[in-house]
Amino acid sequence: ELKITVLGEGNTDPVARNDVGVIAEDSTLTVSNGANANLVGSYDATGEHSGDVLDTSSTTHYDTDADGDTLSVASVRTGSVEGSGTAGTLGQALTGTYGQLTLSADGSYTYEANQTAADALDLADSVTDVFNYTVSDGNGGTDEGTITITILGINDAPVAQDDVGVISV
């Protein structure tokens, strides 16, 4: 009887973490290199991180690959359900419900709120726009994560309208 045992390391799938961002309805959020200076207000991101989607600057909330492979973003779609929604092209704007996300292969992203879509929000209101993405280790391993952008309402300036009246004498 001949027994063959194959020894070696297989490829372990990467682990993608969910990402969050917070933005005012009339703003643009830019995230790169794990740095996010655009966060507005206070927001609890426990269990999630607010750096680029491949952020390795955090010790607890970062995308990982047990094999040490270099990670890159392979695809992006609208919606919170992984692999569904409208497919986007990396490096190009993908329109969500309340704005546009531009996600690059290196994990950096920009989200620009659509003022028209979010204008009805009052100061205390907020809505979310969710996108899902696939991260790849370049060796066949993939995992999915989401980017959830919270859009905060602002105190919109009043709009004055001209009044017209007719008086009959």
Where is each model-derived feature located?
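Extracellular ectodomain surface segments
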Residues: 13-94, 159-169
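Acidic, turn/loop-rich segments in luminal/extracellular domains of secretory-pathway
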Residues: 1-10, 86-154
